């Protein structure tokens, strides 16, 4: 089945679309304060998303979706875990595997940087329905993913496709970056025991003075450049007494100033891996706690939404 055949598939939804300092010390100080793209640069380090950066991002996402298409072909590995036998064994022992999709996990594009990582784990003693139900509890993300996600709302759903919003923050040393965004999620059933899906951002904005009377959302494509776009591909397969879950997480950010790659790139890689391991650990715990949440509506109109989603 061609993923792009569906009228609401991301193929039809995603639109195509220096840091320069005269003194080396100023450039180093500006980017050091932003702590390697993660801390969020100050106003003097503001970045703006350029058309050529967005075009490169869209091309990259098209390639990622083509790779997903190939995984659906007969004789191909649906799961990244199955490409090497040791991977499945390791996750069954409880490990959460994180690896760059290509090379270092970073691809330089004009005036930007694409980060592409895959994370995989085994959720024991559960079913694909329970995992799928849990990942669809968008209103509960503020509870699942504390302290990173501080607000989460389900905006709409028709079962297979949902819209939701998140406000999340990242703290490092003395700087906090707050991002507010809207997202769409679209899932398909591959078989009775396997599914896959896509989540992509439709709006991401930097938030200044979060929670204060002077709070301000900067226009999309401006601000810190910490995150401009997000896209993910997830795969689920039930077997061996549990569910294998993997996620390819792709992000677009501002680029690294010339001469600072040696300082920035290793830290960005470590933070990327750490964030994905934490995310999957929290997801696994949310699946485990599903029986305790059964019948509760504390996260919004969960019951009707999840019945519709799991029936697709």
Language-model segments: which ranges?
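Bacterial N-terminal signal peptides
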Residues: 30-42
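Eukaryotic helix-grip
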Residues: 47-312
């Amino acid at each position: 089945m061609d993923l792009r055949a569906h009228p609401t598939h991301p193929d039809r939804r995603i639109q195509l679309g220096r840091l320069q300092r005269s003194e080396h010390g100023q450039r180093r100080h500006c980017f050091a304060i932003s702590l390697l793209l993660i801390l969020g640069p100050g106003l003097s380090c503001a970045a703006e998303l350029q058309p050529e950066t967005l075009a490169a991002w869209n091309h990259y996402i098209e390639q990622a979706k083509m790779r997903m298409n190939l995984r659906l072909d007969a004789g191909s590995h649906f799961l990244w875990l199955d490409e090497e036998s040791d991977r499945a064994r390791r996750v069954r022992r409880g490990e959460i595997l994180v690896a760059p999709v290509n090379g270092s996990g970073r691809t330089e594009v004009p005036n930007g940087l694409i980060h592409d990582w895959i994370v995989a784990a085994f959720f024991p003693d559960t079913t694909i329905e329970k995992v799928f139900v849990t990942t669809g509890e968008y209103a509960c993300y503020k509870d699942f993913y504390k302290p990173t996600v501080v607000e989460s709302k389900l905006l709409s759903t028709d079962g297979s496709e949902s819209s939701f919003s998140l406000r999340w923050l990242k703290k490092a040393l003395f700087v906090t970056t707050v991002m507010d965004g809207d997202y769409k999620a679209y899932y398909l059933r591959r078989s009775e025991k396997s599914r896959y899906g896509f989540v992509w951002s439709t709006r991401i904005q930097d938030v200044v003075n979060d929670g204060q009377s002077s709070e301000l959302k900067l226009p999309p494509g401006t601000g810190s450049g910490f995150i401009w776009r997000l896209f993910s591909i997830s795969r689920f397969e039930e077997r061996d007494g549990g569910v294998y879950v993997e996620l390819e997480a792709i992000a677009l950010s501002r680029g690294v100033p010339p001469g600072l790659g040696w300082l920035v790139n290793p830290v960005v890689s470590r933070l990327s891996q750490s964030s994905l391991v934490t995310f999957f650990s929290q997801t696994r715990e949310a699946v485990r706690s599903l029986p305790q949440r059964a019948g509760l509506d504390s996260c919004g109109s969960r019951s009707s939404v999840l019945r519709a989603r799991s029936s697709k």
